[in-house]
Amino acid sequence: MTNVEVAATVAPNQLLDTLTLDNIKEYSNDIDIIELRIDQWEDRHLELLKSNLEQLQELNINANVLVTYRTISQGGKGEMTHEAYMTLLKEIIKNHHCQMIDIEWDSDFDVFAHRDLINLAHRYNKQVVISYHNFQETPDIDILKFTYYKMNQLNPDYVKIAVMPQDKEDVATLLEAVATSADTLDAKVIGISMSKVGLVSRTAQGVFGGTVSYGCLGEPQAPGQIHVKTLKQQLLFYSNH
């Protein structure tokens, strides 16, 4: 059984609104990480990010901020070219006061460029979540384990896979990959089977060696997300049994 951190995903249109800020404050005891999505912004990413981070700092709560730009190819709204995406992440790493950054992984990407970016993040004392998302299916167990293995080779702090299940067997496949990888890899493992079918992957993550579960404060930002308070309660239930 591993300790599982709760990440609350927020995706402001521009600045964080009063309701979201109040919710973060109200449920701060249930939140370990605030995932700030920025792919919904069409432009002014660095300017808006600076303002959002200042808003979160003013709350004075004990939670790390994870900045995520999710591309269309991995289920987000981000339309940047890969080169522009990598440049944006470099600027965020060097110039913004967040504690964590999400870096997408794909088998077609330049391994050396990704390793350099992760090393840069570590030089600026930022933790790295390297992530892979598949909104169409759950790959075979061997592909999932190999993906975790390849991501781990880049020396991130966390390796994350989120996939779409078609049935309960797909959920079991994802959780088996999480359990095996958690026992063998240096990085902390995150595994999410999306939608209602995969809810157990969020609530029982710690049973299988997972380390972070993503929830919401209002409207879910990914299929199957539940409110952070409910998520925290469910995680505690599994940790006490």
From Swiss-Prot:
Which residues does UniProt mark as catalytic?
A: 133 (proton donor/acceptor), 160 (schiff-base intermediate with substrate)
User: Where do the TM regions start and end?
Assistant: none
Q: What class of enzyme is it?
A: lyase
Protein name in UniProt: 3-dehydroquinate dehydratase
Pathway per the UniProt entry: Metabolic intermediate biosynthesis; chorismate biosynthesis; chorismate from D-erythrose 4-phosphate and phosphoenolpyruvate: step 3/7
What positions does the entry give for 3-dehydroquinate binding?
35-37, 70, 202, 225
Which biological process terms from the Gene Ontology are attached to this UniProt entry? Answer: 3,4-dihydroxybenzoate biosynthetic process; amino acid biosynthetic process; aromatic amino acid family biosynthetic process; chorismate biosynthetic process
Enumerate the InterPro entries for this protein: Aldolase_TIM, DHquinase_I, Type-I_3-dehydroquinase
Family membership: Belongs to the type-I 3-dehydroquinase family.
Single GO term (MF)? 3-dehydroquinate dehydratase activity
**Which reaction is this enzyme known to catalyze?**
3-dehydroquinate = 3-dehydroshikimate + H2O
Summary of subunit composition and partner proteins: Homodimer.
Could you say which EC number(s) this protein's record lists? 4.2.1.10
Q: What does this protein do?
A: Involved in the third step of the chorismate pathway, which leads to the biosynthesis of aromatic amino acids. Catalyzes the cis-dehydration of 3-dehydroquinate (DHQ) and introduces the first double bond of the aromatic ring to yield 3-dehydroshikimate.
Annotated keywords? Amino-acid biosynthesis, Aromatic amino acid biosynthesis, Lyase, Schiff base
